[in-house]
Amino acid sequence: NLYQFKNMIHCTVPNRSWWHFANYGCYCGRGGSGTPVDDLDRCCQIHDNCYGEAEKISGCWPYIKTYTYDSCQGTLTSCGAANNCAASVCDCDRVAANCFARAPYIDKNYNIDFNARCQ
């Protein structure tokens, strides 16, 4: 779920608050469209698509589904989720949080003009 995703982000990118990722580029935060502006935005596009795939599982709502995962030490290695939905959502979040840790954060891509740059 989004709360657990926030915690995963804090694990992998401890020097930056989760909300820095909530309004970044074309895909981090509110939906998404257009071409990702950079590698970090591409991480968010992949995460959005992953949630879309998880939603195809009957009764799976990624934004609120809880799951378990290994404790954090810089890299999140595995999800301990017990069912397909929880495992899928956890893996979406784990992959994205690790992707965020590898991708450079470019300040000018935070809070961009969505209508002008993301069509």
From Swiss-Prot:
EC category name: hydrolase
Protein residues bound to Ca(2+): Y27, G29, G31, D48
Co-factor requirement: Ca(2+)
GO molecular function: calcium ion binding; calcium-dependent phospholipase A2 activity; phospholipid binding
Reaction(s) catalysed by this chain's protein: a 1,2-diacyl-sn-glycero-3-phosphocholine + H2O = a 1-acyl-sn-glycero-3-phosphocholine + a fatty acid + H(+)
The EC number(s) this enzyme carries: 3.1.1.4
Cofactor binding mode and count: Binds 1 Ca(2+) ion.
Gene3D superfamilies linked to this entry: Phospholipase A2 domain
Family in the record: Belongs to the phospholipase A2 family. Group I subfamily. D49 sub-subfamily.
Name of the protein described by the UniProt record: Acidic phospholipase A2 DE-III
Species the sequence originates in: Naja melanoleuca (Forest cobra)
